[in-house]
């Protein structure tokens, strides 16, 4: 079973929240106190919630379900792409396009366009075009790959979302909520936990913290896939709301 420990979180700075003046009262129960006008997150609360989320992801992966990793801000994008690729999961690391979930039919058409352009780039079609047309298609390919490259192999809607910075990715969370897709999210002291089924109270800006979240989630996916019982066990349990006293 995937587990993270207190030492891992302390080393990564998971406990450092935002400046006290920017706090969201809905996160009050996860705050231990303040130091130099910075809120300190209570890791005694974070630890079981983080591990509960990891267990949920591991069981999803064991049932061959898809977890979509979402982290589009600068500090998260590269780590999200690398860790998602490591565990073979879909991801969005650049910009969330409105309707990525709720208008998936249109997104699927764009993915087909991306695949067609990839084939044309490889089979010599671009070389037969005028210089201007080839340049236009190359730019189109690069733009589509940047936006959709991480989900082109998703093959349908995901079974769960894992989000770094729930405020920054609020559109993604809203779309998932509309479709009943469970959301796992890192929620800092300045953010609202609304719409998040599995809350991980923690720093959502520090590179080391993001590496810990993403690395742990990727490990959970890998472990789950490696533990499929005869390839037939399917996890269909609905997400439980994350209510922590």
Curated annotation (Swiss-Prot):
Keywords: Ribonucleoprotein, Ribosomal protein. This is Small ribosomal subunit protein uS2. The keyword Protease does not apply. GO terms for molecular function: structural constituent of ribosome. PANTHER family: 30S RIBOSOMAL PROTEIN S2 PROKARYOTIC AND ORGANELLAR (PTHR12534), SMALL RIBOSOMAL SUBUNIT PROTEIN US2M (PTHR12534:SF0). Belongs to the universal ribosomal protein uS2 family. One of its GO terms (biological process) is translation. CDD domains: RPS2. Disulfide bonds: none annotated. Pfam families: Ribosomal_S2 (PF00318). InterPro entries: Ribosomal_uS2, Ribosomal_uS2_bac/mit/plastid, Ribosomal_uS2_CS, Ribosomal_uS2_flav_dom_sf. The keyword Ribosomal protein applies. One of its GO terms (cellular component) is cytosolic small ribosomal subunit.
């Amino acid at each position: 079973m995937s587990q993270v420990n207190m030492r891992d979180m302390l080393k990564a700075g998971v406990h450092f929240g935002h400046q006290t003046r920017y706090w969201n009262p809905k996160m009050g129960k996860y705050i231990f106190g303040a130091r130099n006008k910075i809120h300190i997150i209570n890791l005694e609360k974070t630890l079981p919630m983080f591990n509960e989320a990891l267990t949920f992801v591991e069981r999803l992966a064991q049932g061959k379900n898809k977890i979509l990793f979402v982290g589009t801000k600068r500090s998260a994008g590269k780590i999200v792409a690398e860790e998602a690729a490591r565990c073979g999961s879909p991801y969005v690391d650049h910009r969330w396009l409105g309707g990525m979930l709720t208008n998936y039919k249109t997104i699927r058409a764009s993915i087909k366009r991306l695949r067609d352009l990839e084939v044309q780039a490889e089979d010599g079609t671009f070389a037969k075009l005028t210089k201007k047309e080839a340049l236009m298609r190359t730019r189109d390919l690069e733009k589509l790959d940047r936006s959709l490259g991480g989900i082109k192999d998703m093959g349908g809607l995901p079974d769960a979302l894992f989000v770094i910075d729930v405020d920054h990715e609020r559109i993604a969370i809203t779309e998932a909520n509309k479709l009943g897709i469970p959301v796992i999210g890192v929620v800092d002291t300045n953010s609202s936990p609304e719409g998040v089924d599995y809350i991980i109270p923690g720093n959502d800006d520090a590179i080391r913290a993001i590496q810990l979240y993403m690395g742990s989630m990727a490990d959970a996916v890998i472990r789950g896939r490696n533990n499929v019982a005869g390839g037939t066990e399917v996890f269909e349990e609905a997400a439980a709301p994350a209510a922590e006293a």
